[in-house]
Amino acid sequence: MNEQYSALRSNVSMLGKVLGETIKDALGEHILDRVETIRKLSKSSRAGNEANRQELLTTLQNLSNDELLPVARAFSQFLNLANTAEQYHSISPKGEAASNPEVIARTLRKLKNQPDLNDATIKKAVESLSLELVLTAHPTEITRRTLIHKMGEINNCLKQLDNTDIADYERHQVMRRLRQLIAQSWHTDEIRKQRPSPVDEAKWGFAVVENSLWQGVPNYLRELNEQLEENLGYKLPVDFVPVRFTSWMGGDRDGNPNVTADITRHVLLLSRWKATDLFLKDIHVLVSELSMVDATPELLALVGEEGASEPYRYLMKKLRARLMATQSWLEARLKGEKLPKPAGLLTQNEQLWEPLYACYQSLQACGMGIIANGELLDTLRRVKCFGVPLVRIDIRQESTRHTEALGEITRYLGIGDYESWSEADKQAFLIRELNSKRPLLPRNWEPSNDTREVLETCKVIAEAPKGSIAAYVISMAKTPSDVLAVHLLLKEAGIGFAMPVAPLFETLDDLNNADDVMTQLLNIDWYRGLIQGKQMVMIGYSDSAKDAGVMAASWAQYQAQDALIKTCEKAGIELTLFHGRGGSIGRGGAPAHAALLSQPPGSLKGGLRVTEQGEMIRFKYGLPEVTVSSLSLYTSAILEANLLPPPEPKDSWRHIMDELSVISCETYRGYVRENKDFVPYFRSATPEQELGKLPLGSRPAKRRPTGGVESLRAIPWIFAWTQNRLMLPAWLGAGTALQKVVEDGKQSELEAMCRDWPFFSTRLGMLEMVFSKADLWLADYYDQRLVAKTLWPLGKELRDLLEEDIKVVLAIANDSHLMADLPWIAESIQLRNVYTDPLNVLQAELLYRSRLTEEQGKSPDPRVEQALMVTIAGVAAGMRNTG
């Protein structure tokens, strides 16, 4: 174990040293000395030296306005470098073995050792594997794209330095490159000046595909194939690609007025353009490589006399010409030019697949399998995974927008006000219209801008090439009419196929009613006919946790999934559960393997569809090797969950969870909703108001411009509490509930649940992770520096609660310290704390100065404002997640 850490620590130390030299060259010895003094004080403070802790506070409080930014940047950049080293460590030969693709081999061996599983059953489970990762542009990716690129280059340098055979002169060159990259990062502004537009966000998503997934996916499939061949004697079929990617970037308009129908249309074109660009690079390589002459009669017939001398090249050149013509047409469309479609325009995956697969079959038949299974196989697999659209997009819109649009239509037609009708009347009207042959929308009618936007979006879906839009997600779905309304609006737009429409249940009440809503829908004959035996339902993690606290939300999510699985099974419907998880614990984030195995039995039968949000995309897919690792973990978890499902919880365990849920929800809401001091405390103890100044995502922080905590989106809500290290949304209520159940004499039952029920042990594990990142003295310091004395008792009460919660969780888990079973993560948090602590102290000081300036009616000092933004980015890097 220690060997693993020493490799990581020596890389972190080496990168820190280079950063120190860079700072000295840029700003002089005195700034580096100041940074080093603060670092040493922080280390000593962490080790428990109270005098040094006080000195740390005094030193940071006394920094001049000119010193603020360099000090903030030094610690922030160090944390980015530490994260880069850690990401490399997770895939390096000296790193944590669990992250390597070996995880698939371990799972296959485990499955083979089960007496009631045979190879045929395992093979069948592999063939039904389905993994869809939905990339979302949540404003949590705080790091600029230009810096992410440099971090990737630094990773490559670490890889080269890890090579034991590296010659001295090569090592010298790599170190020089490393110094250049760290200097470039230091001299780059880490805070972007403008908010990204939805198109910028989409381009960020395409960059992830190009820089990592494009190579990572074929590498993962090669790895999976090798492990299956070795363990089961089974080869993956060429056309079997169990993973695909969808994006919300450019499609998610929930609460984001910047995502319009025109934006979605533009992003769809841009996505196709990027696909042609990437496939052109692949075909260019194949034109060069496939110089072979031997071919099957079928291939020779396909190329004719003209291509007989180099049949493979001939086909590849023809495909290249089609790709180039398609790209030119898409470029013109993106510029707003209306051109007729050229002959041979590529719109369907089959058009790419057929010539490539013809070459593949011919090479195999002519004894050149080794060539067929090289670059050509990788390209074929990319066609299956990415294809002509590159990434499909989801459309997401809030349910009330559809209700308002239909209300406007019915009022204009003089048939009443749809918005005020009962649920039964709405359903009767919708089913009647869905069965009707005549259009509902009147001609020459001028709708309001909001309604026009909803209708235009439906038109974009109807016009988009088939397969480029994956699903229509309805956020804040509450009733069957919410789902039927979308189907009617799509029908009116002229959609010619059954678009998957997924209701998103995201508050406590909506999760509790989810099964009832879906049962009603499945009892409608028209609806059953439309969905053809398939239904997608999205489970919201972030908003339910914000509404009721993590304990109540996670139990409601579990029960909703459990009920939906059973209802759909009974009705003969294939259910796909779509998990809207965030990166942070308060938004449903958890280590993938543990999270998947803790779900109700049968929840992954229809495959896994899950959001990958903001900064988690970079941590899990930022490099091809990390992509292989992440996809391997998902694959092994899905196989294990489907073949060795977790046990059904005992009735007594369910009763305890009901109890925990009620107590934790009451506690959570008692503070967040009912305590009159809570909102003023939240606003002053965290940088919530200042977060709005950060140009993070294209989406506003609030659903409505006014209003309290309830109108805040889940992300800024979590982000703010992560910054001041109280981490409140991720634990409030949970420990109080556990303590009450322990006091009722049920500790042994809780211990059994922790031992034998993955759902419960994962909940406790997530709490331990949060507790490891929370910090009582820092949260206290924010109070001392920023909060009115009248609110101090509330802060103390919350910190005391946190302390009690830690004790009760350790008692149930039978551990003496946090994260005892995940020492690697505990070590990683400790490593970063030394650098995050000064940023937290500095942030509290900067918030104090910034607010004082505002109170005095003076204009803000740009040095203070800029340094504040840097500390926010730095703490986010230290915590490894933002919201």
UniProtKB/Swiss-Prot annotation:
Query: Mind telling me which GO cellular component terms the entry cites?
Result: cytosol
Pfam families reported in the protein's UniProt record: PEPcase (PF00311)
Q: Which PROSITE patterns match?
A: PEPCASE_1, PEPCASE_2
GO BP annotation list: carbon fixation; oxaloacetate metabolic process; tricarboxylic acid cycle
The source's superkingdom equals: Bacteria
Catalyses: oxaloacetate + phosphate = phosphoenolpyruvate + hydrogencarbonate
Give the UniProt family note: Belongs to the PEPCase type 1 family.
The record's subunit annotation is: Homotetramer.
Q: What does this protein do?
A: Forms oxaloacetate, a four-carbon dicarboxylic acid source for the tricarboxylic acid cycle.
Q: What is this protein called?
A: Phosphoenolpyruvate carboxylase
Gene name, per UniProt, is ppc
